[in-house]
Amino acid sequence: MIHDAVLDYYGRRLATCSSDRTIKIFEIEGETQRLTETLKGHDGAVWCVSWAHPKYGNILASAGYDGKVLIWREQNGAWQRIYDFSLHKASVNVVSWSPHEAGCVLACASSDGNVSVLEFKDNNSWEHSIFHAHGLGVNSVSWAPATNPGSIVSSKPSPKSTGNRRFVTGGSDNALKIWAFDAATGAYKLEREPLTGHTDWVRDVAWSPTVLQKSYIASASEDRTVRIWTSDPANPQQWNCKVLGFDAAVWRVSWSLSGNVLAASGGDNKVTLWKENLKGEWECVKSIEE
């Protein structure tokens, strides 16, 4: 079974991962695709793959049931495994690269309740931190935009700047938590009290890429709801919530590139698209069924 399929930044390469413990790389040309590489290194099903931004080279992360996060890099047509991270004690469910402005940084969410953050440094070395996030396991992670809301034009960061390193996690404790990088300690710290309201596992979280007036986070849950959390720059610690009801558990949420349309999918075999109207209410603008 194929668990994930992700195109690279330019849409020219497709990475897939499977229960057969492999990752496959395909070259995409028009309507055709050609298998160019099969990467082996995991000891169990591979749940997810994720491409880094091309400014850091052709770098791919993979994670799976074996609790490992593997980093792969292609140079001169050859793929090599350049880093193994194996401190998690259970399945790593998802990996997510930060916005490229914040560095080459990967957040990893695991069923052991921990989140790890791996950073690729200028000297080709890797640094990592790992911390406890959700008592019953972490199912999802999503980075905030590198630019704070309301500041469409920002000054160019210094070479040593870490940007706006914040992300949200969703867990089997039914909660969302927002984490922010503390440059003084070099650690990620809980930014505020957890966002609560879901009555079952949070399966997915997605932080909208918009840098307009508000921050938006969507969360999908086994409780048959999607919650859309909003925060105003004037009071960034205050998050308000709108609830969207569904007929089945909701597994995935994803924002459009502009951050104003939300796609949700789940156990009802539908993909629904949602948009905020002028009154601040969320409306289903399209439903796609199998």
From Swiss-Prot:
Keywords assigned: Cytoplasmic vesicle, Endoplasmic reticulum, ER-Golgi transport, Membrane, mRNA transport, Nuclear pore complex, Nucleus, Protein transport, Repeat, Translocation, Transport, WD repeat
Membrane topology: Peripheral membrane protein
Listed GO MF terms: structural molecule activity
Compartments, as annotated in UniProt: Cytoplasmic vesicle, COPII-coated vesicle membrane; Endoplasmic reticulum membrane; Nucleus, Nuclear pore complex
Gene Ontology BP annotations: COPII-coated vesicle budding; ERAD pathway; mRNA transport; nuclear pore localization; positive regulation of DNA-templated transcription; positive regulation of ER to Golgi vesicle-mediated transport; positive regulation of protein exit from endoplasmic reticulum; positive regulation of TORC1 signaling
WD repeats: 1-36, 41-82, 87-128, 133-189, 197-239, 245-284
Keyword Membrane: yes
SUPFAM superfamilies reported for this sequence: WD40 repeat-like (SSF50978)
Superkingdom to which the source organism belongs: Eukaryota
GO cellular component, one term: GATOR2 complex
Known role: Component of the coat protein complex II (COPII) which promotes the formation of transport vesicles from the endoplasmic reticulum (ER). The coat has two main functions, the physical deformation of the endoplasmic reticulum membrane into vesicles and the selection of cargo molecules. It also functions as a component of the nuclear pore complex (NPC). NPC components, collectively referred to as nucleoporins (NUPs), can play the role of both NPC structural components and of docking or interaction partners for transiently associated nuclear transport factors.
PANTHER family: NUCLEAR PORE COMPLEX PROTEIN SEC13 / SEH1 FAMILY MEMBER (PTHR11024), PROTEIN SEC13 HOMOLOG (PTHR11024:SF2)
Family: Belongs to the WD repeat SEC13 family.
Self-association state and partner proteins as the record states: The COPII coat is composed of at least 5 proteins: the SEC23/24 complex, the SEC13/31 complex, and the protein SAR1. Component of the nuclear pore complex (NPC). NPC constitutes the exclusive means of nucleocytoplasmic transport. NPCs allow the passive diffusion of ions and small molecules and the active, nuclear transport receptor-mediated bidirectional transport of macromolecules such as proteins, RNAs, ribonucleoparticles (RNPs), and ribosomal subunits across the nuclear envelope. Due to its 8-fold rotational symmetry, all subunits are present with 8 copies or multiples thereof.
Protein name (Swiss-Prot/TrEMBL): Protein transport protein SEC13
Organism: Chaetomium globosum (strain ATCC 6205 / CBS 148.51 / DSM 1962 / NBRC 6347 / NRRL 1970)
